[in-house]
Amino acid sequence: MKYNVYNDWPRKNVIFTDFTPSMIDAEEFQKIVKLLSEKVPDDVDYIVSPEARGFIWGSAVANHLGKGFIPLRKKRKLPEDAVMASYDYKTEYSVDTLEIPKCSIKNSKCFFVDDVLATGGTFKAAKVLIDTLNANLIGGVVIYNIGLKDIVRVKHLYFAELPLKK
């Protein structure tokens, strides 16, 4: 897997892992999408991913599996009347807000896809937002787990199981 690591970016004591080299290489990109897709249970209805890098991986997985894709947007990226719910959460270096667009997914099974897991805050925010819509976030997968500290437990968790090699 091709990636770059930047220490102390965007702040001191933060390790930024960039998978752009894997996206540029078409074969590598397809390989990662396939590996991520293999972790998604067959009965999942929607792939859910946070803005911004999660959109790349999540939408590719949704397309690969023929599933719907629900984008979790950053604050003020949607018109106010298009937002169903929002949730404030902590990342390793900031406090952010995720918003979920109005959609009818009641009783659906959703699966989280993102590039990196650092604190579990984004995953927790996704769980809260999906719960708000009376749907179920049944699991998640990331390419790289920087250092899971506290995670909301769900049935299918695949954090740091992909073969990450430089």
Label the predicted regions.
Residues 1-44, 101:
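Active-site-facing substrate-recognition patch
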Residues 44-51:
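Short glycine-rich phosphate-binding loop at a beta-alpha junction
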Residues 45, 108, 138:
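Conserved acidic residues
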Residues 52, 74-76, 146:
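Short, ordered loop/turn segments at secondary-structure junctions
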Residues 56-65, 127:
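Short Gly/Thr/Asp-enriched flexible loops that form oxyanion-binding sites at enzyme active sites
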Residues 67-111:
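Short, glycine/charge-rich flexible loops or terminal/linker lids adjacent to PRPP-binding catalytic cores
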Residues 114-127:
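Acidic, divalent-metal-coordinating active-site segment for phosphoryl/phosphodiester hydrolysis
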Residues 124-166:
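PRPP-dependent phosphoribosyltransferase catalytic core
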